[in-house]
Amino acid sequence: MSDGTSNAPTRKHTALPKAQILIEALPWLTRHHGKTVVIKFGGNAMIDEDLKAAFAQDVVFLRHAGLKPVVVHGGGPQISAALDKHGIVSEFKAGLRVTTEDAMDVVRMVLAGQVQRELVGLLNQHGPLAVGLTGEDAHTLTATKHQPEIDGELVDIGRVGEITEIDTGAIEALLADGRIPVVSSIARSQDDHHVYNVNADTAAAALAAALGAETLMVLTDVEGLYEDWPDSDEVISRLTASELEKLLPDLSSGMVPKMEGCLHAVRGGVTTARVIDGRVQHSILLEIFTDEGIGTMVVPDEQGES
């Protein structure tokens, strides 16, 4: 008579591959537990409804997995649309938006009143987690006028700021309370009583360094940093800060603030900075919790041989 413990074949459960995926994530969960990760939200992920929803899911997943996510956002597409609607001409110089006084009013309105509110709402569909603030709040970001150099000459690009000071107190208080800070890339002015538009890539990198973050993640509309664009679409999966510094002069203008941000972050003590394809749903989870990862990772020089 059988006791039910015969040598019958083990049933092949269809869910077993999911267990393997979870186990693959275990060492990464252990490594990142309790660590701060700053995520710059931008590109197509900001205007595609499915990508926005997936982004919110990823960030909330990080929070429940024991990480401390901080979201920094710009609003390029939304700002351009609003400026067109108000009949304000907008142009870019050195990869940065020229921001007149009139344009600054629109930038502030769109970032703090539209993009941030929508993102906070998406995150809070999963629980009372996200809190929105701008760099003005609690003096989180302070900036002075930024004048880039083009062909050897300083160029006036209006109310575009260069971050001079960061106060992480408000963000750290929110993280300690289990919240997800969502920061709009606007800074208070060190020079006058106005505000500055600051590049969101730059703001995210500066915040990551100031917070002592484990990781900076920058969402883009490309797969990562290409090895020899446009002659090759081979993505560089990993490089050191010094290797990146050598490549900077030859990068396209749109990638310069992103890669300069990554360089600043790792030189400022952030363990890794990653540029990932925001067009891929759940790219954040793929980058952090899988062996292969996705995109380009920048590491400090001393990690180059590891």
Curated annotation (Swiss-Prot):
<dbReference type="InterPro" id="IPR041727">
    <property type="entry name" value="NAGK-C"/>
</dbReference>
<keyword id="KW-0808">Transferase</keyword>
<keyword id="KW-0067">ATP-binding</keyword>
<keyword id="KW-0963">Cytoplasm</keyword>
<dbReference type="InterPro" id="IPR037528">
    <property type="entry name" value="ArgB"/>
</dbReference>
<feature type="site" description="Transition state stabilizer">
    <location>
        <position position="40"/>
    </location>
</feature>
<protein>
    <recommendedName>
        <fullName>Acetylglutamate kinase</fullName>
        <ecNumber>2.7.2.8</ecNumber>
    </recommendedName>
</protein>
<comment type="function">
    <text>Catalyzes the ATP-dependent phosphorylation of N-acetyl-L-glutamate.</text>
</comment>
<comment type="pathway">
    <text>Amino-acid biosynthesis; L-arginine biosynthesis; N(2)-acetyl-L-ornithine from L-glutamate: step 2/4.</text>
</comment>
<keyword id="KW-0547">Nucleotide-binding</keyword>
<dbReference type="InterPro" id="IPR001048">
    <property type="entry name" value="Asp/Glu/Uridylate_kinase"/>
</dbReference>
<keyword id="KW-0055">Arginine biosynthesis</keyword>
<dbReference type="InterPro" id="IPR004662">
    <property type="entry name" value="AcgluKinase_fam"/>
</dbReference>
<feature type="binding site">
    <location>
        <begin position="75"/>
        <end position="76"/>
    </location>
    <ligand>
        <name>substrate</name>
    </ligand>
</feature>
<keyword id="KW-0418">Kinase</keyword>
<dbReference type="GO" id="GO:0005524">
    <property type="term" value="F:ATP binding"/>
</dbReference>
<keyword id="KW-0028">Amino-acid biosynthesis</keyword>
<dbReference type="GO" id="GO:0006526">
    <property type="term" value="P:L-arginine biosynthetic process"/>
</dbReference>
<dbReference type="GO" id="GO:0005737">
    <property type="term" value="C:cytoplasm"/>
</dbReference>
<feature type="binding site">
    <location>
        <position position="97"/>
    </location>
    <ligand>
        <name>substrate</name>
    </ligand>
</feature>
<dbReference type="InterPro" id="IPR001057">
    <property type="entry name" value="Glu/AcGlu_kinase"/>
</dbReference>
<dbReference type="Pfam" id="PF00696">
    <property type="entry name" value="AA_kinase"/>
</dbReference>
<dbReference type="InterPro" id="IPR036393">
    <property type="entry name" value="AceGlu_kinase-like_sf"/>
</dbReference>
<dbReference type="GO" id="GO:0003991">
    <property type="term" value="F:acetylglutamate kinase activity"/>
</dbReference>
<feature type="site" description="Transition state stabilizer">
    <location>
        <position position="258"/>
    </location>
</feature>
<feature type="binding site">
    <location>
        <position position="197"/>
    </location>
    <ligand>
        <name>substrate</name>
    </ligand>
</feature>
<comment type="similarity">
    <text>Belongs to the acetylglutamate kinase family. ArgB subfamily.</text>
</comment>
<dbReference type="GO" id="GO:0042450">
    <property type="term" value="P:arginine biosynthetic process via ornithine"/>
</dbReference>
